[in-house]
Amino acid sequence: YVIIVPDNLKDAVEKLSNWKKQKGYSVIVQTVEDILKSSKFKIGANQNCFDKESSVREWLKDRYKNSGAFFCLFIGDYRTSAPIRKFNISSRLTDVNSHKYTPTDAYFSDLISQWDLQKDPSGIYSCSVYSASFSPTIPVGRLLCASREEIERYTNKLILYEMFPGRG
């Protein structure tokens, strides 16, 4: 069980990590910043590590190759340093608030396919729905929290639900 968290929220996931360990999971808590400091996965370390998201994906691929199947939980949202990849959605398919980029974690769950990422004129790396694979290699979840309090609330609710499923 891998938890990827921004450095400033690492201490806030300790209770969640301990709970998962009590449930029998082997848990690794890794910060985004530590991945990016690693000589093997820092941006520019190789052709596959060209931005934060690609470096985190390469780290996940390495963990998967060396550890086998696991689950990845990202902690953080747009207010944090948590990585996110976006799809370039044609405006004729959807026009939600005129945004043509839709966030997705499919990039991090599909560790086998070669994603055709292109940098658009605004400097955003994106992928069209036609060049991406939607076949997950690992399950990926995301806890949309940006503060210690939000993480603690979620963790308390999760523990209560998992201890007493009918009452959560």
What do the predicted segments below correspond to?
Residues 1-168:
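Cysteine-dependent hydrolase recognition
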